[in-house]
Amino acid sequence: MNLKILGIDPGSRNCGYAIMEANKGKNILIEAGLIKIKPSTLQYQITELCEGLDLIFKNHSFDEVAIEDIFFAYNPKTVLKLAQFRGALSLKILQIHGDFAEYTPLQVKKAVTGKAKATKEQVAFMVKRLLGLSKDIKPLDITDAIAVALTHAANLRVRV
């Protein structure tokens, strides 16, 4: 059975997304990119993020949606901003799609590389290898979103 998965890596400057099809252990990347968030007021940035997500859902339908949870940050302002972005994304996904899966950065790293403490570069290398891609994927926000989708695909296979 083919499953179309949307993987999301929320960020304060860019939100990475990946659209992947998973079928019997074979994963095919359909599209990946960024919702770019311009420097502005927080309210405008949240609106921009939600409009970008609306556009993705307008152009695609999904069986599953997975989002990476907030990572630990030393700057409290950054954590608060990310939490607000994540809350807005969560609400938008629930309104458009319904339920979604959440994975911590450690879960994503472990699922993709086998090591919970892997670097972003190690994750990027394994994403490229697992999907059989010839070119590097940049920026790493996109790679992280693909890794979230791969993690969810692997988790679904375990549950089925």
From Swiss-Prot:
GO terms for biological process: DNA recombination; DNA repair. The keyword Ligase does not apply. The active site is at 9, 68, 141. It catalyses: Endonucleolytic cleavage at a junction such as a reciprocal single-stranded crossover between two homologous DNA duplexes (Holliday junction). Pfam families: RuvC. One of its GO terms (molecular function) is crossover junction DNA endonuclease activity. The keyword Kinase does not apply. Keywords: Cytoplasm, DNA damage, DNA recombination, DNA repair, DNA-binding, Endonuclease, Hydrolase, Magnesium, Metal-binding, Nuclease. It is found in: Cytoplasm. Its cofactor is Mg(2+). Binds 2 Mg(2+) ion per subunit. Coiled coil: none annotated. Mg(2+) 1 binds at residues 9, 141. Its EC number is 3.1.21.10. SUPFAM superfamilies: Ribonuclease H-like (SSF53098). Mg(2+) 2 binds at residue 68. GO terms for cellular component: cytoplasm; Holliday junction resolvase complex. The RuvA-RuvB-RuvC complex processes Holliday junction (HJ) DNA during genetic recombination and DNA repair. Endonuclease that resolves HJ intermediates. Cleaves cruciform DNA by making single-stranded nicks across the HJ at symmetrical positions within the homologous arms, yielding a 5'-phosphate and a 3'-hydroxyl group; requires a central core of homology in the junction. The consensus cleavage sequence is 5'-(A/T)TT(C/G)-3'. Cleavage occurs on the 3'-side of the TT dinucleotide at the point of strand exchange. Belongs to the RuvC family. Homodimer which binds Holliday junction (HJ) DNA. The HJ becomes 2-fold symmetrical on binding to RuvC with unstacked arms; it has a different conformation from HJ DNA in complex with RuvA. In the full resolvosome a probable DNA-RuvA(4)-RuvB(12)-RuvC(2) complex forms which resolves the HJ. This is Crossover junction endodeoxyribonuclease RuvC. It comes from Campylobacter jejuni subsp. jejuni serotype O:23/36 (strain 81-176). The gene is ruvC.
